[in-house]
UniProtKB/Swiss-Prot annotation:
Annotated keywords: Host-virus interaction
Pfam families per the UniProt record, alphabetical: Gemini_AL3 (PF01407)
Protein's name in the database: Replication enhancer protein
Species annotation: Bean golden yellow mosaic virus (isolate Puerto Rico-Japan) (BGYMV)
Keyword NAD on entry: no
Cleaved signal peptide residues: none
Length: 132
């Protein structure tokens, strides 16, 4: 859903894509925080994937922040170590695919989190399209 207007995103908007070699450094990965709940063997990584300016311009987006909560049983991996693995797998999937868009990035995250140590992935996205 477009967070500015409240309208649903159409299938055309969600599948709109650009060749990955046309946009240098298309994604910015940021770890927001890492939680270690008490008395559990889980670690929760809060990861934000941001589309850079050139990619937003090519897809007619005003703002695109994809927020993921990754619940894992991986106690050994620090936040930066997990973020590097996550980033590598997402970009590997997108480079193999050759195109990048909103749905393709979400599919790449599903590919990156399809591991035995990942329990759950929660998504909360902030997407705004240009009016004009």
């Amino acid at each position: 859903m477009d967070s500015r207007t409240g309208e649903n995103i159409t299938a055309h908007q969600a599948e709109n894509s650009v060749f990955i070699w046309e946009v240098p450094n298309p994604l910015y990965f940021k770890i927001m925080r890492v939680e270690d709940p008490a008395y559990t063997r889980t670690r929760i990584y809060h990861i934000q994937v941001r589309f850079n300016h050139n990619l937003r311009k090519a897809l007619d987006l005003h703002k695109a922040f994809l927020n993921f909560q990754v619940w894992t049983t991986s106690i050994q991996a620090s936040g930066t170590t997990y973020l590097n693995r996550f980033r590598l797998l997402v970009l590997l999937y997108l480079h193999r695919l050759g195109v990048i868009g909103i749905n393709n990035v979400i599919r790449a995250v599903q590919f990156a989190t399809n591991k035995s140590y990942v329990n759950t992935v929660l998504e909360n996205h902030d997407i705004k399209y240009k009016f004009y």
